[in-house]
Structures are given as C-alpha cells and as structure tokens.
UniProtKB/Swiss-Prot annotation:
The keyword Magnesium does not apply. The modification ADP-ribosylarginine is found at residue 101. Keywords: 4Fe-4S, ADP-ribosylation, ATP-binding, Iron, Iron-sulfur, Metal-binding, Nitrogen fixation, Nucleotide-binding, Oxidoreductase. The gene is nifH1. Changing residue 16 to Q/P: Loss of nitrogen fixation. Its cofactor is [4Fe-4S] cluster. Belongs to the NifH/BchL/ChlL family. One of its GO terms (molecular function) is nitrogenase activity. It comes from the Bacteria. It catalyses: N2 + 8 reduced [2Fe-2S]-[ferredoxin] + 16 ATP + 16 H2O = H2 + 8 oxidized [2Fe-2S]-[ferredoxin] + 2 NH4(+) + 16 ADP + 16 phosphate + 6 H(+). This is Nitrogenase iron protein 1. It comes from Azotobacter vinelandii. Its EC number is 1.18.6.1.
Length: 290
C-alpha cells in the first residue's frame, strides 16, 4: 500500500489531538505503520502515544544544538504505542517569531533525513487550531498531505471553522492534489448533532466519515496519558475509534469542497433550531430594552 499522508484540522479545543491519537492507535492495532507529526507549538500531539507530558520538539532541539542541520533523525523521532513514530515540530516562545515556521522546518528536516521512506502506511499531521494560513497550511500548501479530515461538532464556531478550512483546501486543491476526506464529528452532545453535521457535510460536498460520541472514558485515559485503545481496549469508545480507523482506511471519497457563505451556515443552524431566526429589530437592544 502506498503511503497516505493525512492532515487533521479543526477549531482550537475541538479535540483534534485526542481524536488523532486514538485514530492512530486504532490503526497501529490493525497492524498499520504510522507516523504522527505534531504541527502545534504546544507539542501535545503525541503525549498519549508516548505517555509523556510533551515530547522534545525539533525547534527546541535545533536551538540547543545550534541549527537543525546538527540534529539526527533519532534525536527527534520517538516510537510509542504500537510502534507509532512520533515527532513534534514545536515553535518559538509565545509572542516571538512565527510558529508556522517550525512546521516548515520540521517537515523539511524529516524529508531530508529520510523519515518518510520507512515503509509507512500513514503519516498524520495534527495541525494547530483552524489556522489555514502561512506555515500551518504547509501540509496542504506544499502537497505534503493529500487527505484532509476536519474535526468538528454541532456548535456554531466549530462548523464555522470547518467551512473556513474548506476554503483553504479549495485554494490549494486547484494547484495540487490535496482533497477533503470528510468531517469527523467529535460530539459535544448538542441537539440533533449528527443530523446537523451530515447536513453540513452534504452542503460542502463531502461526508461525515464518523460520529464519535462523548464518553468520560476519554478523559480517564487522558489523565493517564493514554489513548482509550490502550487504556481500556474493551470500552465501547475504543470500538468507535476502531470504526473511524476502518473508515479512513477504506475511504475513497476525496473531494474539492464547496464552502458555503455565512448566510447559508446561519440558515442551516436556524433550520435545526440551533439559532433563532434573525430579527433585526432586536439588534443592539439591551435585556432591559427588549
């Protein structure tokens, strides 16, 4: 099987890193050879696979060594659960420099050192927040990742971010091979959430590839710095991540999305009763005035 490169995007705090690591653990359990490249200065994209607080990042180690050229692949690449290879790009201190630059440096270093040549089945890029500009767009801008999966929920801002990320994909899809593989709904237990995300996916021309229900076992596993797959393999939630992994393996629906307007998104939310029909007469009125 040819190596597949996938990037996971989504609104900040939506559960991208947790979802990615549980998905990757399920793939490893299936016998797939996987590498995770964390593209977030927080360096939390690999902690559940490695059972660590935060992996040393390429940018930190490059600063200590002098330059990135002074690093060896084994300095930055750590193996975790199921033989999953883990790398964190890292970034500068908050408020200093461009964190996206760390992503560019990291991916270039991995390529030059031959990290992608080791009969891998999948590479996953876990990308910061909903930023699709600059360095954070590198996995899609430079055609590193061919498949994009967007983690979202039935909350308005998560859907807004999914639509924005779709716009970024369209921008780069026309000049390369990047495509949207689907929406992963990481449930927040909002009303009619699965129906709403299926409707959004239809409008974008894609699919809801899986609905991941909310379950406290995820937090219990995270406290122990473990994926659910490893912490409680018999849990129903572990089966949800296995189902997601199988769907990703079998996925053939890779599309250039059709982003919608803000008005269309609001209409969709109104249709599902998430948002009230707009009444211009109440705009700017205080609670007392209304």
């Amino acid at each position: 099987m040819a190596m597949r490169q996938c990037a996971i995007y989504g609104k900040g705090g939506i559960g991208k890193s947790t979802t990615t690591q549980n998905l990757v653990a399920a793939l490893a359990e299936m016998g797939k050879k996987v590498m995770i490249v964390g593209c977030d200065p927080k360096a939390d994209s690999t902690r559940l696979i490695l059972h660590s607080k935060a992996q040393n990042t390429i940018m930190e180690m490059a600063a200590e060594a002098g330059t990135v050229e002074d690093l060896e692949l084994e300095d930055v690449l750590k193996a975790g659960y199921g033989g999953v290879k883990c790398v964190e790009s890292g970034g500068p201190e908050p408020g200093v420099g461009c964190a996206g630059r760390g992503v560019i440096t990291a991916i270039n270093f991995l390529e030059e050192e031959g990290a992608y040549e080791d009969d891998l089945d999948f590479v996953f890029y876990d990308v910061l927040g909903d930023v699709v500009c600059g360095g954070f767009a590198m996995p899609i801008r430079e055609n590193k990742a061919q498949e994009i999966y967007i983690v979202c929920s039935g909350e308005m801002m998560a859907m807004y971010a999914a639509n924005n990320i779709s716009k970024g994909i369209v921008k780069y899809a026309n000049s390369g091979s990047v495509r949207l593989g689907g929406l992963i709904c990481n449930s927040r237990n909002t009303d009619r959430e699965d129906e709403l995300i299926i409707a959004l996916a239809n409008k974008l021309g894609t699919q809801m590839i899986h609905f991941v229900p909310r379950d406290n076992v995820v937090q219990r596993a995270e406290i122990r710095r473990m994926t659910v797959i490893e912490y409680d393999p018999k849990a129903k939630q572990a089966d949800e991540y296995r189902a997601l992994a199988r769907k990703v393996v079998d996925n053939k629906l890779l599309v250039i999305p059709n982003p919608i307007t803000m008005d269309e998104l609001e209409e969709l939310l109104m249709e599902f009763g998430i948002m009230e029909v707009e009444d211009e007469s109440i705009v700017g009125k205080t609670a007392e005035e209304v």
